[in-house]
């Protein structure tokens, strides 16, 4: 049996209304002044309620309304500077994956020198930084407002680097929050489009974690359950946005998808490249790519793909199981009204030209089936064409 290790972080409070325990948790962490970073487009009443719970405990709050939807490095610099100027000892990361990653990164970088601003961030990205994990000397609580990105659960911060022209990763065990407040109420007003693409991001995370060189028995237990929940409940929340049982199941599925002590594969390398080149939301990219990435690993991940089939309620004994699963995923994407690359005005030749950036992203190195630039170009062509496998 393959070895693996787990960590106790983050601690999790799950359930409706759990976001209103933020003040209580910050007080337990000993925080006296908190930077609250949140999506600029969140309902102000929701923001006020969470911040009110913190202020009720006598904790001062500095607000940062994050307007960057793609984890842009400028947001990290802004958030970090605000934290330094106000000498905060706690961070609240509330929003979708981009905002959470910006706040997480800022919480790590307040203690390092960045003489060239956003350009200096390059020195701390995976592939450029060889030092020990960056520490965090302040409390950190994450509250996701979507069910899909899983950023609340991970040690990674995905940042759009203006210097590199790619989405890069800042990684540290300290990026994991002290507490995650997993409140389905925070997702109930999410528009159908964002419900769809964040849900597909969760499905992509779990599928890639299984079809990854780091996959293990723990991954199978955790990500198998995540897929069972997301496959059943994503179509429900898309059509019934205020179905709170389904919302709760999706919130849990998204969290579990990134807690299986595994990683990703070529799918997320392609999603990061396409997202950076065409400024398409990450979950939208994952919706296009996930079926193709899964089918690509079919010769090396037969056991895992059959597990995915079982989680989806498909015939795991089928001799064409990989094709069946990939096609079912494509049909789900289409049923959710997610536009194809062509429908978004992207040209095929431009799309496949992102292949070199796929190879720069290190996540593909964990793919069971090795990737080359020529193969990446071929896979991007399959993604663009959006056809069922025959």
Q: For each predicted feature, which ranges?
A:
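Carboxylate- and glycine-rich phosphate/diphosphate-binding segment that chelates Mg2+/Mn2+
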Residues: 155-262, 374
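Active-site nucleophile and cofactor-binding loops and adjacent substrate-binding regions
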Residues: 68, 94-96, 279-285, 346
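C-terminal charged capping/lid subdomain of soluble metabolic enzymes
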Residues: 309, 315-390
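Structural motif
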Residues: 11, 33-35, 62, 89-92, ...
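ATP/NTP phosphate-donor binding region
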Residues: 1-90
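Active-site segments that bind and position negatively charged phosphate/pyrophosphate groups
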Residues: 209-328
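Glycine/threonine-rich beta-strand-loop-alpha-helix active-site module
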Residues: 74-184
